[in-house]
């Protein structure tokens, strides 16, 4: 039962954080290509690790990450207002590069397939 509740809390916090990032944060450094890939709330609801994927060049990624990290207080306040929990978790922003790694692997597989078809 506890795992089921934790999963529901993770999904609800993920949905709200994504909405907050896209609709409520007005920082010009934040690019539109930021997506929340996962949220992991601890069992005691004290901390929420928010994994974000940021597309763009390195400078845009760094600026977007700084904008998100400077907005964690606002994000936490909004989570507390929107999600009814006993404790509002402290938000920790982490970068998730899994989508980029997946795209790179897909490109490698595509190039191998092209090389194989050219050899035949």
Swiss-Prot record:
One of its GO terms (biological process) is maturation of SSU-rRNA. It is found in: Cytoplasm. One of its GO terms (molecular function) is ribosomal small subunit binding. Keywords: Cytoplasm, Ribosome biogenesis. InterPro entries: KH_dom-like_a/b, RbfA, RbfA_dom_sf, Ribosome-bd_factorA_CS. The keyword Cytoplasm applies. The keyword Transport does not apply. It comes from the Bacteria. GO terms for cellular component: cytosol. One of several proteins that assist in the late maturation steps of the functional core of the 30S ribosomal subunit. Associates with free 30S ribosomal subunits (but not with 30S subunits that are part of 70S ribosomes or polysomes). Required for efficient processing of 16S rRNA. May interact with the 5'-terminal helix region of 16S rRNA. Monomer. Binds 30S ribosomal subunits, but not 50S ribosomal subunits or 70S ribosomes. Belongs to the RbfA family. NCBIfam families: rbfA (TIGR00082). HAMAP family: RbfA. This is Ribosome-binding factor A. It comes from Clostridium botulinum (strain Loch Maree / Type A3).
């Amino acid at each position: 039962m506890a795992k089921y509740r934790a999963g529901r809390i993770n999904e609800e916090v993920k949905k709200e954080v994504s909405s907050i990032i896209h609709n409520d944060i007005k920082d010009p450094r934040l690019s539109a290509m930021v997506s929340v890939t996962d949220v992991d709330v601890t069992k005691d609801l004290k901390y929420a690790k928010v994994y974000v994927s940021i597309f763009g060049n390195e400078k845009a990624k760094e600026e977007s990450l700084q904008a998100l990290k400077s907005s964690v207080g606002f994000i936490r306040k909004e989570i507390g207002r929107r999600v009814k929990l006993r404790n509002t978790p402290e938000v920790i922003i982490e970068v998730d590069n899994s989508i980029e790694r997946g795209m790179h692997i897909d490109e490698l597989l595509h190039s191998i397939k092209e090389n194989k078809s050219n050899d035949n």
